Amino acid sequence: MSITPADLSPASSSDHREKLQELLTAVRDLHDTALQELQAKIAKLKKERCLDAQKLSEFHSKNQHLREQQKIQQEKIRQLEDRLRSGPCDRCTVKEKQIKKTNTELEDNNQRNLSVISELEAERKTLTDENRRLSLELERLRRSGSPQNTSSEAEEGMIPDSPLRPLSLPVASKMKRRKEQNHVRYTETPLSLSHPESRQREQSVAFGCNGKGVLVAETCEMDATSVAERDNKRHFRIVVPETCRPDVYPEQVDDVDDDDLHIPSHTEQNQKPELRDCTNILIAGQNDDSPLILRCRPLASQDHQSSIDDVLRTPANSSTCVLTKGKRKHSNGAKKDREISDCRLDADETDIKGIIFASTPANGRLQSKNQETSEIETTQDSKKKCLDGHTPRKSLVQNHHAPFPYDQSWSVDPGADLGQYDTESSPQPEHQARTDLETLDTDCTFVSHSLLLRGQKTTGQSQTTGIGQKANDSLADIFDKTGYGEYESCPQDDSIDLKQDSVYEEEREEDDPEEKPEAAVVFRRPADRKPLVSDSDKSSRNKSFACVEVVRKKDERRKLKGHYCKECEVYYADLPEEEREKKLTSCSRHRYRYIPPSTPENFWEVGFPSTQTCVERGYIKEDEQPDVRIRRRRPYLAMFSPKAKSQKKKH
């Protein structure tokens, strides 16, 4: 830009000065404003710095104070550690010493108490032993002083020729046994018995009974034989209570009146468990024409001891030793107050029981010439030879090791209750007589119809033995029956209900198909509507079947509590507790609301169309679109049609 001289005129120069002056004033103003702003900022920063300095001083003072407190705490900790290292204080040491002293005193007292207790126990034991010894001595003195218990001394000690050792029982059990057996008396009715034997074997019996009888108590595993010969008319009898295979050697006794003989039997029921099965009363009778016959008879219970007697009935030309139970009195065959009759057992049932029941006439007298002996023998040939032989036995030495001719697997204690025994006993083989003696359960023996009726011959008349003929033999067959003329003390009830099972009936038909029933029996079951009559013909016999009727009606069933399942629990899980229990109780009866019937009406009638035709004609309506779910799901909504399933698959 070129400056012309015209421009350098004084007028133009004045203008330029004014403009420059204005610019300078403007710049000065701007500078002043900026400087003021900066000074204000500096003052503000100075104030903040002062405040920070004050805070810093405060923090420093606090820090110093905390450091001083920390030093004090560390000093205290050091002092406490020094005290712990130095040990407990004096007070603690004194307390510890006192505690140790009391503990030692308590231990010493306990030791002294234990020693005193041991001494007292030893003294008590010695006193009990002395008391037992004195009581045994007192009991022995009482028995030796009483004239009735002369044979009890032998029972307390060891019996000669007996494998059993003497057992020391407590005095309480002995006194209890004597108390229980105190009311039992055994009186023997003497009758003439021929027993020819010399007096040279009289010493074989260790405990003699004044020449009147022998009482052998609790002997086991021995042979029960007795030799009797003719041409010597002397009274001889052997009463053996609670024996199992006893061994009684022949002996010679004096010819003394036996009316005053009294031999009580004190049974020890709780002495050994092995002796509970060996409690038979063996009553031996000997005649002139037949060998010795051992007869077993189960005694009645203690409730009937005063009214039931045990009497032996012997064949012709023989005399019997009768063992009666009751008060001690003089009795003979002509003056008997009690009359006893028994159910006779047929000889055809000999393979069933092996037990001999003896019976007497109705008038109570021993009429041996007008009656025959009814005996039951076992099926074994060896046992039959011991009973069927009509010649007297040669000697005891030959038959010493022979087995007992009867099965001794069960017996009846004369002092025990008869209710725990059964009147039936199945035969046991000879080789099992010893092994089964310990393991056989003799409380109840079951004999089926086939076994009971196998050995019985077909007869035209009804034979009622009273034992083993029916599956449910009544209690009348167990007890004795006293008869006088047409009167019976324990008559048979002809109208008794026979609760026979169909299993017994089928078993009886299979095992014995040719056997005919003895009489037509009419019986009725509680559930039978009509009585069923069993005819004499087996082929036309009607079997009885129990009929069960509906007891509860529909209204009663609705009131019952229902059964619920896991699905119902899940289904009703969102309900409250009370409402859920209410729903679950009716769970088993709500399925009919959701499950449609499987078949329509008249489906099984002839001419009804098929299911597809019923669907096409509209007989069966299918719900293709079910209702909206009331809750989470409806598990019992069932769709049975395959057509609906195929349509759902297509969609």
Curated annotation (Swiss-Prot):
InterPro entries: CtIP_N (IPR019518), Ctp1_C (IPR013882), RBBP8-like (IPR033316)
A Pfam entry, by short name: CtIP_N
Annotated positions of the Phosphothreonine modification: T599, T611
Coiled coil: 35-84, 117-138
Composition bias type Basic and acidic residues, residue spans: 380-391, 525-539
EC class (word): hydrolase
Compositionally skewed regions (Polar residues) per UniProt: 363-379
EC number: 3.1.-.-
Keyword NADP annotated: no
Family of this protein: Belongs to the COM1/SAE2/CtIP family.
Annotated protein name in UniProt: DNA endonuclease RBBP8
